[in-house]
A protein has these predicted regions:
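Core alpha/beta nucleotide-donor-binding catalytic domains of modification enzymes
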Residues: 1-54, 60-79, 86
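Short catalytic/ligand-binding loop motif for oxyanion handling, primarily in non-cytosolic enzymes
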Residues: 22-26, 63-66, 103-107, 120-124
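S-adenosyl-L-methionine-dependent DNA methyltransferase catalytic core
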Residues: 110-187
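Secondary-structure boundary elements
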Residues: 49, 53, 84-91, 116-127
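An acidic- and aromatic-residue-enriched active-site/binding cleft used to recognize and process polar
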Residues: 60, 97, 118
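Conserved S-adenosyl-L-methionine
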Residues: 90-101
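A short, glycine/Asx- and small/polar-enriched loop/turn
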Residues: 8, 105-110
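A short acidic, often aromatic-flanked loop/helix-cap motif at beta-alpha or helix-coil junctions
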Residues: 2-4, 100-104
Length: 187
């Protein structure tokens, strides 16, 4: 209930997540009146009740694009969320990120939103000199090298070390590899 959530104020540093993406996805039945789209208001209400220091929000690219009829919000939901979080006292930045550029084996661009309570931005001016997303781009190469990652890896590349370190077992599916994950099973 709301009282329990309010009691968490000052104790929560980060809320990470976002509402279901199905109603916004360009890959599915993108429908503005999908009832799951209204969960964005529950998310905003949750943020307002808990008041975390930081917000990390993720959704599909379609979240940044308006619907044809635009009868509900009149614009892209991403702009609505940014406006609402700014009203609640957050400095907010949103950006589309292709995670394959950062070594993730999937070719899906996602909308990422980062919010920081205004009081923390005001007390730490270095937070406003360079945005979160500028730092990601600037440090991308160093990150990839430090994690031994490549841009646009295949799934096989990404998990191949699992097979090498723990061994393979014969797969029942033709052309598939099966591995032993975690500790090797003892005989």
């Amino acid at each position: 209930n709301a009282e329990n959530l309010i009691s968490l104020r000052g104790k929560i540093d980060l809320v990470a997540g976002g509402p279901p993406c199905q109603g916004f996805s360009m890959a599915g039945r993108r429908v503005e009146n999908d009832s799951r789209n209204d969960l964005i208001n529950s998310y905003i209400n949750f943020i307002d009740l808990v008041q975390p220091k930081l917000i990390f929000f993720e959704n599909v690219r379609g979240f940044t694009q308006g619907f044809k009829r635009n009868d509900k919000k009149g614009r892209a939901y991403s702009l609505y969320v940014i406006d609402e979080l700014e009203k609640k006292g957050y400095t907010v930045q949103g950006h589309l990120i292709n995670f394959a550029d950062y070594g993730v084996p999937q070719k899906r661009t996602r909308f990422i939103l980062v919010g920081i309570q205004n009081q923390f931005v005001e007390s730490n001016p270095t937070l406003t000199k360079e945005t979160f997303f500028e730092r990601i781009v600037k440090n991308k190469e160093e990150f990839l090298v430090s994690k031994d990652l490549t841009v646009n890896p295949t799934l096989e590349n990404a998990i191949s070390d699992l097979l090498q370190s723990n061994g393979e077992v014969e797969s029942e599916t033709p052309r598939f590899k099966a591995g032993i994950y975690g500790d090797k099973a003892s005989d």
